[in-house]
Amino acid sequence: MERPYVIIVSEVSVDGKLTLYRGASSKELMSLMDEEAYKYLHEIRAKVDGIMVGCETVRTDNPSLTVRYAKGKNPVRIIPCSTANVPLDANVLNTKEAPTIIATTERAPKERLEKIKELGAEVIVVGDELVDFDKLLPELYRRGIKSLMVEGGASINWEFVRRRVVDEIRLIHLPVIVGGENVPTLVGGEGFKKLKNLLHLRLRSHFVRGKQLITEWEVVNKIR
Protein backbone atom coordinates (compact mmCIF):
# COMPACT_ATOMS: atom_id res chain seq x y z
CA MET A 1 0.00 0.00 0.00
CA GLU A 2 1.28 3.45 -0.90
CA ARG A 3 0.68 5.51 2.20
CA PRO A 4 2.04 8.50 4.12
CA TYR A 5 4.83 8.13 6.67
CA VAL A 6 2.80 8.11 9.89
CA ILE A 7 3.87 9.57 13.24
CA ILE A 8 1.60 9.25 16.28
CA VAL A 9 2.31 12.13 18.67
CA SER A 10 0.69 12.57 22.06
CA GLU A 11 1.05 13.81 25.58
CA VAL A 12 0.53 11.04 28.16
CA SER A 13 0.47 10.81 31.92
CA VAL A 14 2.82 8.35 33.63
CA ASP A 15 -0.03 5.81 33.61
CA GLY A 16 -0.67 6.40 29.91
CA LYS A 17 -3.83 8.51 30.13
CA LEU A 18 -4.80 11.13 27.56
CA THR A 19 -7.46 12.97 29.58
CA LEU A 20 -8.70 13.32 33.16
CA TYR A 21 -11.84 11.27 32.50
CA ARG A 22 -13.78 9.87 29.54
CA GLY A 23 -15.29 12.75 27.60
CA ALA A 24 -12.93 15.34 29.05
CA SER A 25 -10.87 17.63 26.86
CA SER A 26 -7.21 16.70 26.50
CA LYS A 27 -6.48 20.42 26.80
CA GLU A 28 -6.77 20.09 30.58
CA LEU A 29 -3.82 17.69 30.78
CA MET A 30 -1.97 19.59 28.08
CA SER A 31 -2.13 22.70 30.26
CA LEU A 32 0.60 21.02 32.33
CA MET A 33 2.99 21.20 29.37
CA ASP A 34 5.47 24.07 29.33
CA GLU A 35 6.31 26.20 26.31
CA GLU A 36 9.21 23.97 25.26
CA ALA A 37 6.87 20.99 25.02
CA TYR A 38 4.49 23.00 22.84
CA LYS A 39 7.41 24.05 20.66
CA TYR A 40 8.37 20.39 20.22
CA LEU A 41 4.80 19.52 19.22
CA HIS A 42 4.50 22.41 16.78
CA GLU A 43 7.92 21.75 15.24
CA ILE A 44 6.60 18.35 14.18
CA ARG A 45 3.42 19.94 12.79
CA ALA A 46 5.55 22.33 10.74
CA LYS A 47 7.44 19.45 9.09
CA VAL A 48 4.58 17.17 8.06
CA ASP A 49 2.20 17.40 5.11
CA GLY A 50 -0.93 16.44 7.05
CA ILE A 51 -2.28 16.23 10.59
CA MET A 52 -5.16 14.03 11.76
CA VAL A 53 -7.49 13.85 14.73
CA GLY A 54 -10.83 12.10 15.09
CA CYS A 55 -14.15 13.94 15.02
CA GLU A 56 -14.67 13.21 18.73
CA THR A 57 -11.49 15.17 19.44
CA VAL A 58 -12.82 17.99 17.27
CA ARG A 59 -16.11 18.05 19.18
CA THR A 60 -14.45 17.87 22.61
CA ASP A 61 -11.29 19.97 22.16
CA ASN A 62 -12.08 22.16 19.13
CA PRO A 63 -8.40 22.27 18.11
CA SER A 64 -7.03 24.48 15.35
CA LEU A 65 -4.21 22.05 14.40
CA THR A 66 -2.07 24.90 13.11
CA VAL A 67 1.57 25.87 13.69
CA ARG A 68 1.90 28.61 16.29
CA TYR A 69 4.90 27.83 18.54
CA ALA A 70 7.33 27.24 15.67
CA LYS A 71 8.09 28.56 12.20
CA GLY A 72 6.70 26.68 9.23
CA LYS A 73 3.64 25.97 7.15
CA ASN A 74 0.33 24.72 8.46
CA PRO A 75 -0.30 21.08 7.53
CA VAL A 76 -3.46 19.89 5.79
CA ARG A 77 -5.98 18.91 8.46
CA ILE A 78 -7.66 15.53 7.98
CA ILE A 79 -10.70 14.59 10.06
CA PRO A 80 -12.13 11.06 9.66
CA CYS A 81 -15.83 11.18 10.58
CA SER A 82 -18.29 8.51 9.44
CA THR A 83 -21.33 10.79 9.60
CA ALA A 84 -19.50 14.08 8.94
CA ASN A 85 -20.81 15.25 12.30
CA VAL A 86 -18.22 18.00 12.67
CA PRO A 87 -19.58 21.21 14.25
CA LEU A 88 -19.89 23.81 11.52
CA ASP A 89 -18.24 26.39 13.78
CA ALA A 90 -15.26 24.11 14.53
CA ASN A 91 -11.83 25.69 14.21
CA VAL A 92 -10.78 23.05 11.69
CA LEU A 93 -13.46 24.35 9.31
CA ASN A 94 -11.84 27.77 9.29
CA THR A 95 -10.11 27.04 6.02
CA LYS A 96 -8.53 30.49 5.84
CA GLU A 97 -5.96 29.18 8.33
CA ALA A 98 -5.21 25.86 6.64
CA PRO A 99 -6.80 23.39 4.20
CA THR A 100 -9.11 20.75 5.67
CA ILE A 101 -10.24 17.35 4.41
CA ILE A 102 -13.24 15.63 5.97
CA ALA A 103 -13.01 11.88 5.29
CA THR A 104 -16.45 10.36 5.55
CA THR A 105 -18.78 7.59 4.33
CA GLU A 106 -21.79 6.96 2.14
CA ARG A 107 -24.09 7.28 5.16
CA ALA A 108 -23.15 10.89 5.85
CA PRO A 109 -26.13 13.20 5.14
CA LYS A 110 -25.66 14.89 1.77
CA GLU A 111 -26.92 18.24 3.06
CA ARG A 112 -24.31 18.09 5.81
CA LEU A 113 -21.56 17.51 3.27
CA GLU A 114 -22.75 20.47 1.20
CA LYS A 115 -22.57 22.78 4.22
CA ILE A 116 -19.03 21.59 4.95
CA LYS A 117 -18.02 22.19 1.34
CA GLU A 118 -19.51 25.69 1.46
CA LEU A 119 -17.09 26.46 4.30
CA GLY A 120 -14.20 25.59 2.01
CA ALA A 121 -13.32 22.12 3.28
CA GLU A 122 -12.81 19.20 0.93
CA VAL A 123 -14.90 16.06 1.39
CA ILE A 124 -13.78 12.59 0.39
CA VAL A 125 -15.97 9.50 0.76
CA VAL A 126 -14.03 6.37 1.72
CA GLY A 127 -16.31 3.65 3.01
CA ASP A 128 -19.95 2.66 3.35
CA GLU A 129 -20.64 2.62 7.11
CA LEU A 130 -17.23 3.36 8.62
CA VAL A 131 -14.26 5.33 7.29
CA ASP A 132 -12.05 2.79 5.51
CA PHE A 133 -8.47 3.64 6.44
CA ASP A 134 -7.17 1.14 3.89
CA LYS A 135 -8.68 3.40 1.22
CA LEU A 136 -8.07 6.69 2.99
CA LEU A 137 -4.30 6.41 3.40
CA PRO A 138 -3.51 5.72 -0.30
CA GLU A 139 -5.90 8.53 -1.25
CA LEU A 140 -4.05 10.96 1.01
CA TYR A 141 -0.75 9.83 -0.49
CA ARG A 142 -2.08 10.48 -3.99
CA ARG A 143 -3.05 13.97 -2.87
CA GLY A 144 0.53 14.76 -1.91
CA ILE A 145 0.37 13.98 1.80
CA LYS A 146 3.57 11.97 2.15
CA SER A 147 3.92 12.48 5.91
CA LEU A 148 1.07 12.41 8.42
CA MET A 149 1.04 13.39 12.09
CA VAL A 150 -1.69 11.68 14.10
CA GLU A 151 -2.66 13.48 17.31
CA GLY A 152 -5.34 10.99 18.34
CA GLY A 153 -7.32 10.29 20.27
CA ALA A 154 -7.33 6.70 21.43
CA SER A 155 -9.77 5.37 18.80
CA ILE A 156 -7.95 6.93 15.85
CA ASN A 157 -4.60 5.72 17.21
CA TRP A 158 -5.98 2.16 17.33
CA GLU A 159 -7.01 2.32 13.67
CA PHE A 160 -3.37 2.90 12.74
CA VAL A 161 -1.85 0.55 15.31
CA ARG A 162 -4.08 -2.42 14.51
CA ARG A 163 -3.26 -2.11 10.81
CA ARG A 164 0.46 -1.66 11.61
CA VAL A 165 0.57 1.43 9.40
CA VAL A 166 2.38 3.65 11.88
CA ASP A 167 6.11 4.33 11.55
CA GLU A 168 6.91 6.30 14.69
CA ILE A 169 5.36 7.09 18.07
CA ARG A 170 6.54 10.21 19.89
CA LEU A 171 5.39 10.84 23.45
CA ILE A 172 5.49 13.87 25.71
CA HIS A 173 5.47 12.43 29.23
CA LEU A 174 3.68 14.39 31.94
CA PRO A 175 4.86 13.59 35.49
CA VAL A 176 1.38 12.89 36.87
CA ILE A 177 -0.86 9.90 37.62
CA VAL A 178 -4.49 10.20 36.50
CA GLY A 179 -5.92 6.77 37.38
CA GLY A 180 -9.36 5.49 36.45
CA GLU A 181 -10.47 2.31 34.71
CA ASN A 182 -12.36 3.92 31.84
CA VAL A 183 -10.11 6.89 31.15
CA PRO A 184 -8.79 6.93 27.55
CA THR A 185 -5.22 5.75 27.12
CA LEU A 186 -2.84 6.25 24.20
CA VAL A 187 -4.42 3.44 22.19
CA GLY A 188 -8.03 2.30 22.50
CA GLY A 189 -9.96 -0.32 20.53
CA GLU A 190 -10.34 -3.99 21.39
CA GLY A 191 -6.61 -4.59 21.78
CA PHE A 192 -4.44 -7.35 20.33
CA LYS A 193 -5.19 -9.90 23.10
CA LYS A 194 -2.39 -12.28 22.02
CA LEU A 195 1.33 -11.88 22.61
CA LYS A 196 2.16 -12.80 19.02
CA ASN A 197 0.00 -9.96 17.70
CA LEU A 198 1.60 -7.11 19.66
CA LEU A 199 3.08 -4.06 17.96
CA HIS A 200 6.80 -3.95 18.73
CA LEU A 201 8.76 -0.73 19.20
CA ARG A 202 12.41 0.24 19.37
CA LEU A 203 13.46 3.25 21.44
CA ARG A 204 15.16 5.62 19.03
CA SER A 205 15.68 8.63 21.25
CA HIS A 206 14.89 10.05 24.67
CA PHE A 207 15.63 13.50 26.02
CA VAL A 208 14.27 16.26 28.23
CA ARG A 209 12.62 19.26 26.58
CA GLY A 210 11.72 21.96 29.06
CA LYS A 211 10.45 19.97 32.03
CA GLN A 212 9.08 17.07 30.01
CA LEU A 213 10.64 13.74 29.14
CA ILE A 214 10.26 13.03 25.42
CA THR A 215 10.54 9.51 24.03
CA GLU A 216 10.63 8.70 20.32
CA TRP A 217 9.88 5.14 19.24
CA GLU A 218 10.33 3.37 15.92
CA VAL A 219 7.78 0.71 15.02
CA VAL A 220 9.57 -2.54 14.23
CA ASN A 221 6.84 -4.75 12.76
CA LYS A 222 5.03 -2.19 10.64
CA ILE A 223 3.54 -2.73 7.20
CA ARG A 224 4.61 -0.50 4.31
UniProtKB/Swiss-Prot annotation:
PANTHER family reported for this sequence = 2,5-DIAMINO-6-RIBOSYLAMINO-4(3H)-PYRIMIDINONE 5'-PHOSPHATE REDUCTASE, DIHYDROFOLATE REDUCTASE FAMILY PROTEIN (AFU_ORTHOLOGUE AFUA_8G06820)
Keyword Transmembrane helix belongs to the record: no
Function field: Catalyzes an early step in riboflavin biosynthesis, the NADPH-dependent reduction of the ribose side chain of 2,5-diamino-6-ribosylamino-4(3H)-pyrimidinone 5'-phosphate, yielding 2,5-diamino-6-ribitylamino-4(3H)-pyrimidinone 5'-phosphate.
User: Which pathway does this polypeptide act in?
Assistant: Cofactor biosynthesis; riboflavin biosynthesis
Q: How does it assemble?
A: Homodimer.
Positions binding NADP(+) in this chain are 57, 61, 82-85, 131, 153-156
Q: Which reaction does it catalyse?
A: 2,5-diamino-6-(1-D-ribitylamino)pyrimidin-4(3H)-one 5'-phosphate + NADP(+) = 2,5-diamino-6-(1-D-ribosylamino)pyrimidin-4(3H)-one 5'-phosphate + NADPH + H(+); 2,5-diamino-6-(1-D-ribitylamino)pyrimidin-4(3H)-one 5'-phosphate + NAD(+) = 2,5-diamino-6-(1-D-ribosylamino)pyrimidin-4(3H)-one 5'-phosphate + NADH + H(+)
**Protein name, per record:** 2,5-diamino-6-ribosylamino-4(3H)-pyrimidinone 5'-phosphate reductase
Protein species of origin: Aquifex aeolicus (strain VF5)
UniProt family annotation: Belongs to the HTP reductase family.
Q: Which GO terms describe its molecular function?
A: 5-amino-6-(5-phosphoribosylamino)uracil reductase activity; NADP binding; oxidoreductase activity, acting on the CH-OH group of donors, NAD or NADP as acceptor; protein dimerization activity
Q: Which Pfam families match?
A: RibD_C
